[in-house]
Protein backbone atom coordinates (compact mmCIF):
# COMPACT_ATOMS: atom_id res chain seq x y z
CA UNK A 1 0.00 0.00 0.00
CA UNK A 2 1.02 3.60 -0.55
CA UNK A 3 1.38 5.04 2.93
CA UNK A 4 1.99 8.40 4.51
CA UNK A 5 4.22 8.75 7.52
CA UNK A 6 2.37 10.17 10.54
CA UNK A 7 2.90 13.61 11.97
CA UNK A 8 5.17 13.38 15.00
CA UNK A 9 5.43 16.23 17.50
CA UNK A 10 8.04 16.10 20.25
CA UNK A 11 6.55 17.63 23.39
CA UNK A 12 9.59 16.86 25.54
CA UNK A 13 12.67 14.66 24.95
CA UNK A 14 10.67 11.76 26.42
CA UNK A 15 7.13 12.47 25.14
CA UNK A 16 5.95 12.39 21.52
CA UNK A 17 2.49 12.90 20.00
CA UNK A 18 1.64 10.95 16.83
CA UNK A 19 -1.34 11.38 14.47
CA UNK A 20 -2.26 11.14 10.77
CA UNK A 21 -3.78 14.57 10.11
CA UNK A 22 -4.00 14.42 6.31
CA UNK A 23 -5.63 11.02 5.83
CA UNK A 24 -7.27 10.24 9.14
CA UNK A 25 -8.14 13.34 11.14
CA UNK A 26 -11.51 13.94 9.43
CA UNK A 27 -12.30 10.27 8.74
CA UNK A 28 -10.90 8.58 11.83
CA UNK A 29 -9.77 11.07 14.50
CA UNK A 30 -6.76 9.55 16.19
CA UNK A 31 -3.97 10.36 18.59
CA UNK A 32 -1.13 8.35 20.07
CA UNK A 33 1.16 9.36 22.92
CA UNK A 34 4.59 7.76 23.13
CA UNK A 35 6.44 8.06 26.41
CA UNK A 36 10.01 6.90 27.02
CA UNK A 37 9.77 4.89 30.23
CA UNK A 38 13.43 3.97 30.64
CA UNK A 39 16.86 4.38 29.04
CA UNK A 40 19.64 1.97 29.95
CA UNK A 41 22.61 2.54 27.67
CA UNK A 42 21.57 1.38 24.20
CA UNK A 43 18.30 -0.04 25.57
CA UNK A 44 15.14 2.05 25.41
CA UNK A 45 11.65 1.15 26.65
CA UNK A 46 8.70 3.16 25.35
CA UNK A 47 5.03 3.10 26.31
CA UNK A 48 2.50 3.75 23.53
CA UNK A 49 -1.07 4.85 24.33
CA UNK A 50 -3.62 5.77 21.68
CA UNK A 51 -7.28 6.31 20.86
CA UNK A 52 -9.21 6.54 17.58
CA UNK A 53 -12.81 6.92 16.37
CA UNK A 54 -13.23 5.06 13.03
CA UNK A 55 -16.99 5.64 12.70
CA UNK A 56 -16.67 8.52 10.20
CA UNK A 57 -14.57 6.40 7.81
CA UNK A 58 -16.92 3.44 8.13
CA UNK A 59 -19.99 5.58 7.37
CA UNK A 60 -18.26 7.26 4.44
CA UNK A 61 -17.67 3.85 2.82
CA UNK A 62 -21.27 2.64 3.15
CA UNK A 63 -22.29 1.30 -0.23
CA UNK A 64 -18.72 0.06 -0.79
CA UNK A 65 -17.43 -1.67 2.34
CA UNK A 66 -20.66 -1.63 4.32
CA UNK A 67 -24.36 -1.79 3.32
CA UNK A 68 -26.18 1.53 2.87
CA UNK A 69 -29.15 0.33 4.97
CA UNK A 70 -31.30 3.06 3.42
CA UNK A 71 -34.49 1.02 3.85
CA UNK A 72 -33.76 -0.40 7.30
CA UNK A 73 -33.00 0.75 10.82
CA UNK A 74 -29.50 -0.79 10.74
CA UNK A 75 -26.59 1.58 11.08
CA UNK A 76 -22.86 1.93 11.64
CA UNK A 77 -22.58 2.82 15.31
CA UNK A 78 -20.12 4.94 17.20
CA UNK A 79 -17.09 2.91 18.27
CA UNK A 80 -14.15 4.12 20.35
CA UNK A 81 -10.87 2.23 19.93
CA UNK A 82 -8.30 2.68 22.71
CA UNK A 83 -4.91 1.00 22.38
CA UNK A 84 -1.94 0.37 24.60
CA UNK A 85 1.48 -1.02 23.83
CA UNK A 86 5.12 -1.23 24.76
CA UNK A 87 8.20 -1.11 22.54
CA UNK A 88 11.70 -2.25 23.49
CA UNK A 89 14.59 -1.24 21.25
CA UNK A 90 18.31 -1.93 21.53
CA UNK A 91 21.29 -0.67 19.59
CA UNK A 92 23.01 2.48 18.44
CA UNK A 93 23.86 1.74 14.81
CA UNK A 94 21.88 -1.44 14.12
CA UNK A 95 18.64 -1.20 16.08
CA UNK A 96 16.60 -4.24 17.13
CA UNK A 97 12.99 -3.59 18.16
CA UNK A 98 10.23 -5.64 19.75
CA UNK A 99 6.71 -4.28 20.08
CA UNK A 100 3.50 -5.54 21.72
CA UNK A 101 0.23 -3.67 21.16
CA UNK A 102 -3.38 -4.38 22.09
CA UNK A 103 -6.45 -2.48 20.83
CA UNK A 104 -10.12 -2.97 21.73
CA UNK A 105 -13.36 -1.66 20.27
CA UNK A 106 -15.81 -0.07 22.71
CA UNK A 107 -19.31 0.39 21.20
CA UNK A 108 -20.95 3.68 22.15
CA UNK A 109 -24.47 2.49 21.41
CA UNK A 110 -25.96 0.13 18.82
CA UNK A 111 -23.84 -1.03 15.87
CA UNK A 112 -24.77 -3.34 12.96
CA UNK A 113 -21.48 -3.28 11.03
CA UNK A 114 -19.89 -6.71 10.58
CA UNK A 115 -16.32 -7.85 9.75
CA UNK A 116 -15.43 -7.15 6.12
CA UNK A 117 -13.73 -10.41 5.07
CA UNK A 118 -11.54 -8.26 2.82
CA UNK A 119 -7.83 -7.53 2.24
CA UNK A 120 -5.54 -8.00 5.23
CA UNK A 121 -4.50 -4.33 5.72
CA UNK A 122 -8.14 -3.24 5.81
CA UNK A 123 -9.16 -6.16 8.01
CA UNK A 124 -6.45 -5.37 10.55
CA UNK A 125 -7.15 -1.64 10.53
CA UNK A 126 -10.83 -2.10 11.43
CA UNK A 127 -10.52 -5.32 13.44
CA UNK A 128 -10.88 -3.68 16.89
CA UNK A 129 -14.07 -1.92 15.80
CA UNK A 130 -15.60 -4.89 13.93
CA UNK A 131 -14.38 -7.92 15.92
CA UNK A 132 -13.79 -6.22 19.27
CA UNK A 133 -10.08 -6.94 19.60
CA UNK A 134 -6.68 -6.88 17.94
CA UNK A 135 -3.28 -7.80 19.35
CA UNK A 136 0.00 -7.30 17.50
CA UNK A 137 3.52 -8.58 18.12
CA UNK A 138 6.37 -7.25 15.98
CA UNK A 139 10.09 -8.00 15.80
CA UNK A 140 12.15 -5.67 13.63
CA UNK A 141 15.66 -4.66 12.65
CA UNK A 142 16.96 -1.40 11.20
CA UNK A 143 20.49 -1.16 9.77
CA UNK A 144 22.37 1.65 7.95
CA UNK A 145 24.28 0.52 4.86
CA UNK A 146 25.43 3.93 3.66
CA UNK A 147 25.00 7.50 4.93
CA UNK A 148 22.02 7.86 2.56
CA UNK A 149 20.67 4.29 2.66
CA UNK A 150 19.07 2.27 5.47
CA UNK A 151 17.45 -1.15 5.37
CA UNK A 152 14.76 -2.46 7.66
CA UNK A 153 12.74 -5.64 8.03
CA UNK A 154 10.10 -6.98 10.38
CA UNK A 155 8.13 -10.09 11.29
CA UNK A 156 4.56 -9.55 12.51
CA UNK A 157 1.85 -11.58 14.21
CA UNK A 158 -1.74 -10.44 14.79
CA UNK A 159 -4.75 -11.97 16.48
CA UNK A 160 -8.22 -10.49 16.02
CA UNK A 161 -11.58 -11.16 17.64
CA UNK A 162 -14.16 -13.74 16.48
CA UNK A 163 -16.26 -13.29 13.34
CA UNK A 164 -19.03 -15.06 11.44
CA UNK A 165 -18.68 -17.25 9.46
CA UNK A 166 -15.89 -18.70 11.58
CA UNK A 167 -12.33 -18.31 10.34
CA UNK A 168 -8.82 -18.34 11.77
CA UNK A 169 -8.18 -15.18 13.83
CA UNK A 170 -4.44 -15.38 13.18
CA UNK A 171 -2.62 -13.13 10.71
CA UNK A 172 1.09 -13.43 9.90
CA UNK A 173 3.16 -10.86 8.08
CA UNK A 174 6.58 -9.62 7.16
CA UNK A 175 8.09 -6.58 5.52
CA UNK A 176 11.34 -5.38 4.03
CA UNK A 177 12.18 -1.87 2.88
CA UNK A 178 14.95 0.50 1.93
CA UNK A 179 14.99 4.12 3.13
CA UNK A 180 16.72 6.41 0.63
CA UNK A 181 17.68 9.85 1.90
CA UNK A 182 16.81 12.17 -0.99
CA UNK A 183 17.67 15.43 0.78
CA UNK A 184 18.42 16.77 4.24
CA UNK A 185 14.70 16.73 5.05
CA UNK A 186 13.19 14.04 2.83
CA UNK A 187 13.34 10.25 2.66
CA UNK A 188 11.86 7.88 0.08
CA UNK A 189 10.92 4.38 1.25
CA UNK A 190 10.53 1.46 -1.17
CA UNK A 191 9.67 -2.05 -0.05
CA UNK A 192 7.10 -4.81 0.18
CA UNK A 193 4.74 -6.27 2.77
CA UNK A 194 3.47 -9.86 2.80
CA UNK A 195 0.40 -11.15 4.66
CA UNK A 196 -0.68 -14.73 5.39
CA UNK A 197 -4.31 -14.98 6.58
CA UNK A 198 -7.62 -16.83 6.31
CA UNK A 199 -10.17 -15.35 3.88
CA UNK A 200 -12.41 -18.45 3.59
CA UNK A 201 -10.57 -19.48 0.42
CA UNK A 202 -10.84 -23.10 -0.70
CA UNK A 203 -9.14 -25.29 -3.30
CA UNK A 204 -10.20 -28.61 -4.82
CA UNK A 205 -7.52 -31.21 -4.07
CA UNK A 206 -7.26 -34.97 -4.38
CA UNK A 207 -7.10 -36.76 -1.05
CA UNK A 208 -5.08 -39.83 -0.11
CA UNK A 209 -8.11 -41.97 -0.97
CA UNK A 210 -8.18 -40.61 -4.53
CA UNK A 211 -11.32 -38.56 -4.01
CA UNK A 212 -11.52 -34.89 -4.85
CA UNK A 213 -12.51 -32.60 -2.01
CA UNK A 214 -12.52 -28.95 -1.04
CA UNK A 215 -9.82 -27.87 1.39
CA UNK A 216 -9.49 -24.57 3.24
CA UNK A 217 -6.29 -22.72 2.36
CA UNK A 218 -4.83 -19.44 3.59
CA UNK A 219 -4.30 -16.39 1.42
CA UNK A 220 -0.79 -15.04 0.85
CA UNK A 221 -0.79 -11.47 -0.46
CA UNK A 222 2.17 -9.25 -1.33
CA UNK A 223 1.74 -5.48 -1.33
CA UNK A 224 4.22 -2.83 -2.50
CA UNK A 225 5.26 -0.23 0.05
CA UNK A 226 5.90 3.38 -1.00
CA UNK A 227 6.38 6.15 1.53
CA UNK A 228 7.70 9.70 1.35
CA UNK A 229 8.78 11.37 4.58
CA UNK A 230 9.34 15.08 5.09
CA UNK A 231 10.95 16.32 8.30
CA UNK A 232 10.88 19.93 9.40
Question: What are these model-predicted stretches?
Answer:
Residues 1-3, 10-25, 29-33, 45-53, ...:
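Transmembrane beta-strand segments that form the barrel wall of outer-membrane beta-barrel proteins
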Residues 122-126, 132-145, 154-160, 179:
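Transmembrane beta-strand segments of outer-membrane beta-barrel domains in Gram-negative
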Residues 3-6, 85-87:
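Short, charged beta->alpha transition segments
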Residues 22-134, 138, 194, 203-230:
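Outer-membrane pore/translocation modules
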Residues 2-3, 82, 135, 172:
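Residues that act as N-cap/strand-start positions at coil-to-secondary-structure junctions
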Residues 11-13, 37-41, 90-96, 143-149, ...:
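Outer-membrane beta-barrel strand-turn architecture
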Residues 157-232:
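Predominantly the C-terminal beta-signal and adjacent terminal strand-loop region
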Amino acid sequence: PISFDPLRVGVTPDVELVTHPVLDLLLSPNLEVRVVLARLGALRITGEYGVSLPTFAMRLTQGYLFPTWKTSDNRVGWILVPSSGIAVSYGERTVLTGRLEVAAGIPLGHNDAKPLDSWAPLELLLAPALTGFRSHVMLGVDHPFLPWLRGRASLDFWRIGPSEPTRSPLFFGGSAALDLKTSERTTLTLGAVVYDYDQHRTEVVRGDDGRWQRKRVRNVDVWPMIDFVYRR
